[in-house]
Amino acid sequence: MAWVAAGSFFINDALALGGVKDKKIGVQLYTVRDDMAKDPRGTLKKIAAMGFGEVENFGYNGKFFGMEASEYKQVLDECGLVAPSGHYLYGNFGNKQNPGTVLFGWEKAVADAKAIGQTYMAIAFLMPEERTSIADYKKIAADLNKAGAVCKKAGIQLCYHNHDFEFQELDGQIPFDILANETDPALVKFELDLFWVSKAGKDPIALFKQYKGRVALWHVKDMDNTPNKNFTEVGSGVIDYARIFKHAKTSGMKHFFVEQDVCPGAPLDSIRKSIAHVQSTLLKNL
């Protein structure tokens, strides 16, 4: 699935002054989901050894990869990693009692996020049954405002992570417009997935300008030059990230996450290629 993102790059407040003093490149752990399922501690050590400094979590269900918040935080510390963000679901699917979602157990999710040092929580994906009409999106927007208020009290910023379906007309309207216009900008910002934005035929930089300062997080993943527009390693595809990175200040971006939902071989090999391109080519454009 595409609802988790990868690799995080931290930009401190110096970005507002045009400089970047602290560079920590991170990774969205969904990219290495099979490795995390088998050996989370070992996988995190390998990630750190590649030069990553941050990770973005996924799959929280009351625990982080089977660990309570305190244990997971200890593992991160041992590996020299921090987790500034994590992915969560809305929760209006199945039996509608899905722990760690906006609609069920949100307060605990926020408390656990704070306990491990997260400063962002991102709504990763809307299930098809959650988004059948514009009325659904209006209800989601209202619920995101409430969830964002809970986050704010804990010193955490709520974000919404897009795919391409939010840009497809529904009931004569564009769902992304509803999510943007009917949420409080102070309570709900965006984690813009630049792959899905591009696949939807939108220009990321135009969105940065339209929602200036509100796109706090990016998902950086590349698209190959085939009719299917598949995922590929960053720097191996057709998305002009050198151009995009030059507009980080307009976006308001604080972290970016390199992601590859599907890899041709070992995911660890793919993220190794991606971080090399980020280090050699993209950072200088910030």
Language-model segments: residues:
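Acidic/histidine-rich catalytic cores of soluble enzymes
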Residues: 54-55, 151-238
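Active-site acidic/histidine proton-transfer and metal-coordination neighborhood
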Residues: 7, 17, 54, 95-189, ...
